[in-house]
A protein has these predicted regions:
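Short, charged, surface-exposed loops that flank catalytic or proteolytic processing sites
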Residues: 175-184, 251-261
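Hydrophobic alpha-helical signal peptides and transmembrane signal-/tail-anchor segments
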Residues: 3-17
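Short pre-catalytic strand/loop immediately N-terminal to key active-site residues, enriched for Gly-Thr
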Residues: 35, 223-236
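Charged C-terminal helix
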Residues: 257-293
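Conserved phosphate/ATP/ADP-binding segment of small-molecule kinases
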Residues: 141-223
Length: 293
């Protein structure tokens, strides 16, 4: 048994505290909140909190349940948001990072992007998940105005991570159901970068016959491709799990490609452990698996 002198013990204790303080970063989630189901804010908040980052939220919409049930009620909170930002500014609230997800309207996008642009000037990192569609189709209610709104969000992003469908709509690129080549994937990333985002990932993309996530890291100028094995089941909220784990590791100063792979591995484990669940529409019970992150 090692017995340390009091001064040495205090030194080690203070070093430990300092490491934790340096690691902790405050993040604001601007996304919708579902009353029933682990998606969007309800999926991201417990993960980021578990990873040690104080997490705050601003709902862009209140949704009764996940949309996968086919019936839902939704409340657009744009009017509420317009009153929040002036109060926060008066109180001096600041965040190390902001993550945006579902945006309810073009008006809301303008308000949120203006706030993000203002915060970015103060050193805040902006993450944008341009939620609009999947499997070649836009979600119900998504219009050309929505796409333009998301382009406005990308203009202030340090990192965006659309899926393949969303990347195609954002860049006016034809969607290919059978997948694309690596050169075509890199061209998509270049187009996203041209819209304004510094770095970019594209998820749920088939590259040369392999399910992959592709990325561009503006800090190094590197492109990368990370293949994965697909589990043929669908859960709502897996993209939000990916986003939360990815952002959590990036806030811990992990390199983009490494953080992406870690997020992919967590999503795979979560899906694999829940693939036999009867009611998949409510998402994955995240709190049961936080120790796997």
């Amino acid at each position: 048994m090692n017995i340390y002198p009091p001064a040495l013990f205090l030194f080690y204790y203070l070093c430990s505290v300092l490491r934790n303080v340096m690691k902790t970063k405050q993040i604001l989630l601007i996304n919708d909140m579902a009353g029933y189901g682990k998606v969007a804010t309800a999926a991201m908040l417990p993960i980021l909190s578990y990873m040690g980052h104080p997490t705050y939220n601003l709902p862009t919409a209140l949704v009764s349940n996940t949309l996968d049930y086919g019936k839902f009620n939704i409340l657009d909170t744009t009017d509420y948001i317009t009153g929040v930002f002036p109060v926060w500014k008066e109180l001096g609230f600041k965040f190390d990072a902001i993550s945006t997800g579902f945006i309810a309207s073009e008006r809301q996008a303008s308000i949120v992007s203006a706030y993000c642009r203002e915060q970015e000037k103060n050193g805040t990192t902006i993450f944008v998940d341009p939620i609009m569609g999947d499997e070649g189709k836009l979600y119900n209610g998504v219009t050309p105005a929505t796409i333009n709104s998301m382009r406005e969000m990308l203009a202030v992003a340090d990192l965006t991570f659309p899926n393949y469908t969303e990347a195609c709509y954002l860049t006016d690129t034809a969607y290919k159901a059978d997948g694309i080549t690596l050169d075509e994937a890199r061209e998509l990333l270049r187009k996203l970068h041209a819209i304004g985002t510094k770095s970019a990932l594209i998820t749920s993309i088939c590259v040369d016959g392999q399910h992959s996530v592709v990325g561009f890291n503006h800090m190094t100028g590197d492109y990368f491709e990370l293949p994965y094995t697909e589990i043929p089941v669908h859960f709502p909220g897996t993209g939000d799990i990916f986003s939360a784990v990815l952002i959590g590791h990036l806030l811990d100063n992990e390199p983009l490609s490494k953080a992406t792979r870690q997020a992919m591995d967590v999503v795979y484990r979560f899906i694999d452990l829940n693939k036999d669940n009867v009611d998949k529409n409510r998402g994955i019970p995240i709190e049961n698996y936080l120790d796997l992150i």
